[in-house]
Curated annotation (Swiss-Prot):
PANTHER family xrefs: LIGHT-INDEPENDENT PROTOCHLOROPHYLLIDE REDUCTASE IRON-SULFUR ATP-BINDING PROTEIN
Annotated positions binding ATP: 8-15
ADP-ribosylarginine found at: 98
Keywords associated with the record: 4Fe-4S, ADP-ribosylation, ATP-binding, Iron, Iron-sulfur, Metal-binding, Nitrogen fixation, Nucleotide-binding, Oxidoreductase
Post-translational modification: The reversible ADP-ribosylation of Arg-98 inactivates the nitrogenase reductase and regulates nitrogenase activity.
Residues annotated to bind [4Fe-4S] cluster: 95, 130
Family to which this protein belongs: Belongs to the NifH/BchL/ChlL family.
Biological processes per GO annotation: nitrogen fixation
Gene name tied to this protein: nifH2
The protein's name in its UniProt record: Nitrogenase iron protein 2
Organism of provenance: Methanosarcina barkeri
Catalytic activity from the UniProt record: N2 + 8 reduced [2Fe-2S]-[ferredoxin] + 16 ATP + 16 H2O = H2 + 8 oxidized [2Fe-2S]-[ferredoxin] + 2 NH4(+) + 16 ADP + 16 phosphate + 6 H(+)
Length: 273
């Protein structure tokens, strides 16, 4: 069982990428569980035909510890993928990161991590790598980390910060598997992300071009793999899935100092001095 966490700046398309990646892997015959670790609880919606399933934390609040059953918090979606949303605390109360810790512990106790699973994916909010959001890394749950980024300043800044957190918790066995570029059509984007990944000691595992079919699929409450499996964009996600499945380059990243990061952004024309 490979346990993989997908991190990335909010709004980067992390959940869309993760759902299309897991859908692609399922078409290759893999058995998968996807755990949404984002308070927005939108990590599995396209796999479930637009269903907003009940989150683990909402269920705990309404039913208590004794009232939670696995079939209440876990739904099966496209490709028979097991879908779970950890959810978040009530607004203004508690810590969303702690919710991830609670959810994963509950899933373990309920026997969700079955031996037949090939992959468990964690879709994690990644603007900050505080203790709770780092939990899949820190506790050694996820051994492989992929970061979704683009050629925009804040996306790369967030990716670099995530690598700082990953390097800190590397003794638990977690490694960076690569950078996934979810393109924003920025000039020189592929070259920038390739250079950034190499400076981290890693690689650009795939460049996903921008395509409006992603939005059309989401309007129809489906992944691209489900909506139009013969499309060019579906082939891009399938290539990503093959690259992840065959990836053996797992490293402890070397995050860039801020001066070097800014110099690289200037070199590629992303920011002006």
């Amino acid at each position: 069982m490979r346990q993989i966490a997908i991190y990335g700046k909010g709004g980067i398309g992390k959940s869309t990428t993760t759902q299309n990646l897991t859908a692609s892997l399922s078409t290759m015959g893999n058995k998968i569980m996807l755990v949404g670790c984002d308070p927005k609880a939108d990590s599995t919606r396209m796999l479930l035909g637009g269903l907003n399933q009940k989150t683990v934390l909402d269920t705990l609040r309404s039913e208590g510890d004794e009232g939670v059953d696995l079939d209440v918090v876990m739904q099966r979606g496209f490709g028979d993928i097991k879908c779970v949303e950890s959810g978040g605390p009530e607004p203004g109360v508690g810590c969303a990161g702690r919710g991830i810790i609670t959810s994963i512990g509950l899933l373990e106790n309920l026997g969700a991590y079955t031996d037949d699973l090939d992959y468990v994916f964690y879709d994690v909010l990644g603007d900050v790598v505080c203790g709770g959001f780092a939990m899949p890394i820190r506790e050694g749950k996820a051994k492989e980390i992929y970061i979704v980024a683009s050629g925009e300043l804040m996306a790369i800044y967030a990716a670099n910060n995530i690598c700082k957190g990953l390097a800190k918790f590397a003794k638990g066995g977690a490694r960076l598997g690569g950078i996934i570029c979810n393109s924003r059509n920025v000039d020189g984007e592929r070259e920038l992300l390739d250079a950034f990944a190499k400076k981290l000691g890693s690689h650009l595992i795939h460049f996903i071009p921008r395509d409006n079919i992603v939005q059309r699929a989401e309007i129809n409450r489906k992944t691209v793999i489900d909506f139009d499996p013969e499309s060019n964009q579906a082939k891009e996600y399938l290539t990503l899935a093959h690259n992840v499945q065959n990836n053996d380059k797992l490293v402890v990243p070397t995050p860039l100092p801020m001066e070097e990061l800014e110099a690289m952004m200037v070199e590629f024309g992303i920011v002006d001095l």
